[in-house]
Every structure is written in structure tokens, then in C-alpha cells.
Amino acid sequence: MGESLSPQALAQPLLLQLFVDTRPLSQHIVQRVKNILAAVEATVPISLQVINVADQPQLVEYYRLVVTPALVKIGPGSRQVLSGIDLTDQLANQLPQWLVQQEAFFADREPPEVNIPFTELGQPETPALQQADAFFQLQQQYADLSERTKFLEQVIALVAHDLRNPLTAALLAVDTIQIRSQSFSVATAKEMQGLCSLFDQARSQLREIERMIAEILEATRHSGESLRINPREVVFEPLLQQVLEQLHERWRSKQQQLITDVPGDLPTLYADPDRLRQVLVNLLDNAIKYTPPGGTITIAALHRTSQKVQISISDTGSGIPRDQLSVIFKNLVRLSRDSSQEGYGIGLSVCQRIVQAHFGRIWVASELGQGSTFHFTMPVYRYTMPC
């Protein structure tokens, strides 16, 4: 390799980064590069970091690499990139020049004080790496903000149209009641029945608006913000009956059968009643929506452990494809079966946040053509909530 390097040059290692992919050829190239460097490493300090491009995409972008394998000489001196399948041949030809450049770089300099910070992998963390990490963090923050903004825009666009439907129906029902009430002084039984039906329709539609607004408010909260709950002792059976009454018109209009299986000795829950009602309404609303006319919906509660109660809602609908079970609780997820149904794909995400805020768990079991069962757990009253 010619004359030995000066002490100044020896004080600063040659910093190299080798970018490879997962192809079998990559391991062969890594070994050949190491062999070439080993020939001079006894007299010249060399730091080689092998990087999988899939693990460090920010560095690939930072160095503007377009081909793998690629070897980046970070320093001393100016940066240089070798790439392609003949990389090892390029390195064998280029390495002597790098060593000469290293000697020239330090020829008129004082020996530097070596104080190189190291990464978790034990490799030098150079200013270039620090800049790349900072750049990557900014990219991540920008991507998160962009995704958040896009999500909010999608929600607003969806809500702008869909909120008008139940609101228009409710207002029409109320206006009709007002007009009819002026046309007779003594209402007959039939007329009163009609008025009651209109009132029920208005109430149902207004509650639907209330539910959608609640979902939107929860879904638009920052994902990292913990959900606030006000837990207290809750008797499950009366709360369930209130929810069933609220959705009565929905399942009765489809002639569906609702079966409840709640043990009389079920312990009281330690939960926020409004949040628990929100979960039940969402899950039952979905069950009613996807169960065909004449189908069956079952609500069951089981005291599984001394600290948890499991609540399950089953339907006889079309079921959920297995490959979509893992994403069903994410924001704005709309399955292929949902194309003809109302909704934004945020209800189940809200349910998950509520259940997790109670230190519970929610999951689904489903087979295509055999319906779905959503399970979630809630703490019993004597359970002490963590601070």
C-alpha cells in the first residue's frame, strides 16, 4: 500500500458505510469488502458500518442512493460513493487513493483529539449521521402532521353530507307534528299513535346525530392523548336496556331477534357509564346494520375473572374477511362489505380507545358467511384503577 500513514492520519479512522439489501449476493459482497479492508486494517484504522436499506431509508434518501450495493466514504475529506455489482473492484482500485487523500488531508494539521460518539451498534456517530437522524425525525413529524391533517379533512368532508340526512328527517318529522297538531283539537287514538311514531322517528334521528358527533369528537382527538373517563359503579343490565330501547326502532324495522344473556349475579362494573353506553351503541348499531332482516343478535355478559367482565355481541351477518380482522379497529377503515352502508369507519376505533382507557381489551372473532362476535372486557367495581 506504499508508505505508512502519518500519526495525524492514523488518528482519524476511515469512515465507511456499506448499504445492501436482502439478496443473497449482498452477503457475498459484504464479505469481499471486509476482506479488502482487512488487508490494510492492521496499519490503517477503518470503521465499516453495514446497513440494510430497508432498516435505514432516511440514510438512503440523505445520500441519494439509487443502486445497491453502495459504499459511502464519509471521511476524512470529501464524501465519495461507490455502487453497483462491481463495487468490490471499484473499492480495490479506489482504496489506495483514499489513503493518499487521508494523508494529504492531515498533512498540515495538528493531530485531532479523537472523541467520537458511538451509536447503539458501536459504530461512530458522525455529524453526517446526526444530520441524517435529525432530518429523519423532521420527516416523521411532517408525515404525522400531514396524515393527521388529511384525516381531519376526510372526516369533515364525510360529515358535511351525511349529518344532513338524519337532521333533515328529524326536522321534517317535527314540522309535520307541528302542522298536524294545528288541524285538530281532540286527537283520536289513531292520530295520537301517528304522532307518537313521528316523535319516535325524530328522537331516533336526533340520537343518531348525537352519536355521530360524539364519534367525530373522539376520533379527531390526538392519537397520543389519553381518553378522559369518569368511572363509577355501574349496573350493567339497566344500562343495556336503555341502549336497546334507544335502538329499538332500528332492529324492529328489520324484524330482527335480540337475545340477551346477562346473569343475575353479574357484578357491578367500574366504568364511565356514558363511555360504556357509547361502546354498546356502536357495536349494536353495527350488528343491526350487518345482520339481514329476520336475523339474530345476541348480547351476553360473562364474569370471567375476579377483576373483569366480558361482554360479547354476536350477529348472524355476512362476517368479516380474515385478512381484514387486523385493521378493523383503525381509523377510517371501510371494509369491502361497507360500500353500501353508512358510516365513516371511525366507530370501532373509538370503541377501542374507550375500552383501553378502562384498562380493558376489545377483539373480534368472525368467519365469512357465519357472522361476527365482538368481545370486550370491563373492570368490576371492586377493581382499583391504576393512577
From Swiss-Prot:
Changing H161 to D/E: Period length increases by 2 hours, impaired growth in light/dark cycle at 30 and 42 umol/m(2)/sec photons. Induction: Transcribed in a circadian pattern, protein accumulates in light (at protein level). CDD domains: HisKA (cd00082), KaiB_like (cd02978). Disruption phenotype: No growth phenotype in low, continuous light, dysregulation of expression of many genes. In a light/dark regime cells grow very slowly. At medium light lowers kaiA and kaiBC expression, attenuating but not destroying circadian rhythms and affecting the expression of many genes (clock output). Chromosome compaction remains rhythmic. Loss of circadian control of gene expression; KaiA protein levels are unaffected, KaiC is constitutively phosphorylated. Phospho-RpaA is barely detected. The modification Phosphohistidine is found at H161. It comes from the Bacteria. Changing Q94A: Decreases KaiB-KaiC complex cooperativity. More severe decrease. HAMAP family: Kinase_SasA. Member of the two-component regulatory system SasA/RpaA involved in genome-wide circadian gene expression. One of three clock output pathways. Participates in the KaiABC clock protein complex, which constitutes the main circadian regulator in cyanobacteria, via its interaction with KaiC. Required for robustness of the circadian rhythm of gene expression and involved in clock output. KaiC enhances the autophosphorylation activity of SasA, which then transfers its phosphate group to RpaA to activate it. Autophosphorylation and phosphotransfer activities are not essential for clock rhythms in continuous light, but they are essential for adaptation to light/dark cycles. This is Adaptive-response sensory kinase SasA.
